[in-house]
Amino acid sequence: MNMQESKSIIEVNGVSKFFGEKTALDHVTLNVKKGEFVTILGPSGCGKTTLLRLIAGFQTASEGEIKISGKEITQTPPHKRPVNTVFQKYALFPHLNVYDNIAFGLKLKKMPKQTIEKKVKAALKMVGMTDYEYRDVDSLSGGQQQRVAIARAIVNEPEVLLLDEPLAALDLKMRKDMQMELKEMHKSLGITFVYVTHDQEEALTLSDTIVVMSEGRIQQIGTPIDIYNEPINSFVADFIGESNILNGVMIHDKLVCFCNTEFECVDEGFGENMPVDVVIRPEDLYIFPVSEAAQLTGVVQSSVFKGVHYEMTVLCNGYEFLVQDYHHFEVGALVGLLVKPFDIHIMKKERVCNTFEGKLIDETHVEFLGCNFECAPVTGIEAGSEVKVEVGFDNVILQDNEEDGALTGEVKFILYKGDHYHLTVLSDWDENVFVDTNDVWDDGDRVGITIPPDGIRVIKN
């Protein structure tokens, strides 16, 4: 990449977007280099499409600024920005044929007819639709319509091409074919692509750089290899591919304990006996008949053939491990597992308990999350004082019936930790409550939340 290409063509600085009281984007900062293929990846509702629409100009940022090629364009209307957008639903004009759909923007610019014809034919060639220029768009397949939409976008020679889940409506084979075509197209055009998707495999296949988002914030930015091999937190590790994510304790540098067993690793710089999250990819676990080489022994709980490998669940010391291997082991088989030090990834925990701001009502009552909770007797703190409240993840109890809870909320994120689930519940007070439970809940479940008095720790601010 030369010096010119290494410059940022898109600069998003401290951008937030509010819809009433809802925060769709929370102080997002992102630089996109000229000529890059950048994918913004995340689950539904994470803010990825909102960010794309702000860059395109279809919405306006509530805070912060956006620059393209060094020019501040936060308030600039879409048609005056050097970008074009390809939408999931194509947005083709049904009354125009393929040629006229692609030529539409050029005609608005009042370009000479010969110039328009030359540009349209070049765009059609680029997307492999040379013989389709006079076809009605309604007669085309989904993949062909998507090619026309892309041709219409690139014919204007934008500095940046924005793509909002453009392959989501296609079947699996067509999607994979179009992925490779998009990659080749990006290479040929040399312009900057910013691509939005929730499909992890798509992001890993297409991108120079992946931007992982959750809850309106950027979680991690990196190359596909970096994102996959070195996830920054448990959300990224869980969202990008399959992972075994377990609670562990860093004994000291290069030695970690999880699943009641000590393992050598390559990580260092953590405090002694520090709680950590341990990530092991299923393909990095070796499975074999029990022998002295086994670090763990367990029983195969399930085995499914996936075409190129078997995916097995193995129960070891009360913990479930997902294993991918070319060798097949029957359900019920006693097996050994081994993982090499460089395949164990250690992450600092984002938190070790729930922490809330609160107010001490009296020695046995504290207010937080908009509710008055009974707590164990508090001494040394005056009533009415602002306090910090700590609640262990396993001290939060979820109820099926919302009315049985002191407050209510919605399950937003579920992470399996080998022997329990770690849940993120967005309370109706608009604060996250983190819960460890053996009960099975679904994303989107409405729940009641209770906390027993002995599960609440009140600390003086």
Curated annotation (Swiss-Prot):
It catalyses: ATP + H2O + polyamine-[polyamine-binding protein]Side 1 = ADP + phosphate + polyamineSide 2 + [polyamine-binding protein]Side 1. Signal peptide: none annotated. It comes from Bacteroides fragilis (strain ATCC 25285 / DSM 2151 / CCUG 4856 / JCM 11019 / LMG 10263 / NCTC 9343 / Onslow / VPI 2553 / EN-2). InterPro entries: AAA+_ATPase (IPR003593), ABC_SmlMolc_Importer (IPR050093), ABC_transporter-like_ATP-bd (IPR003439), ABC_transporter-like_CS (IPR017871), Mo/tungstate-bd_C_term_dom (IPR008995), P-loop_NTPase (IPR027417), PotA-like (IPR005893), PotA_ATP-bd (IPR017879). Belongs to the ABC transporter superfamily. Spermidine/putrescine importer (TC 3.A.1.11.1) family. This is Spermidine/putrescine import ATP-binding protein PotA. Keywords: ATP-binding, Cell inner membrane, Cell membrane, Membrane, Nucleotide-binding, Translocase, Transport. Gene3D superfamilies: 2.40.50.100, P-loop containing nucleotide triphosphate hydrolases (3.40.50.300). It comes from the Bacteria.
